[in-house]
């Protein structure tokens, strides 16, 4: 489908880039600008990013932005329940690609907690995340081909609780269809309260997924649907 065929809700922005490199640089510049505004207004800022392979170039570009990183807190939208030393750790990814150079001065608050069970780890993380200076100032989300975002997976056990717009938890246990299955995620109530919300996607398959998500009425079928409303801006390249 053509990007022009996308029928976005009122208040949802769209930025189209020509390549992955352009998207990474442009997204980093927008995030940096929003963080500067937050710092100017309130003296500190909270940035929440997503993991996976797609954000690497963006994280590296953002690490080079001239910011007062010492006044910025960085956290994750979700995490695989693995130690930071594990290859699948989102925290490890952020430390390698974002928290370097001047950006290493940022305060990082991760989700992973060692525990006897995923549920216990989520409870520990929930307590730990009370250090986050909510609400989130800038949130950068991704999206899977199944319409998940963060670790809010369609039909996953615990999804109803995680999608509760009035929920009070800051971290919940979730199960993913792909390995590693055990995940920790910020719930909808925390994510949707972010002041600036950005969704970074790439390619025709993600465009088709986005179009399908816009058409569903039951957000549990494609959880990203819950975020496809103002103040979201979508960053896409073909």
Curated annotation (Swiss-Prot):
Annotated disulfide bonds: none
InterPro entries attached to this UniProt entry: 6-phosphogluconolactonase_DevB, Glc/Gal-6P_isomerase, NagB/RpiA_transferase-like, PGLS
Q: Which top EC class applies here?
A: hydrolase
Domain of life the protein comes from: Bacteria
**SUPFAM superfamilies for this protein:** NagB/RpiA/CoA transferase-like
The UniProt GO MF terms for this protein read: 6-phosphogluconolactonase activity
Its GO biological process annotations read: carbohydrate metabolic process; pentose-phosphate shunt
Q: In which pathway does it act?
A: Carbohydrate degradation; pentose phosphate pathway; D-ribulose 5-phosphate from D-glucose 6-phosphate (oxidative stage): step 2/3
NCBIfam families, alphabetized? pgl (TIGR01198)
Protein's UniProt name: 6-phosphogluconolactonase
Q: Per the UniProt entry, what species is this protein from, by scientific name?
A: Pseudomonas aeruginosa (strain ATCC 15692 / DSM 22644 / CIP 104116 / JCM 14847 / LMG 12228 / 1C / PRS 101 / PAO1)
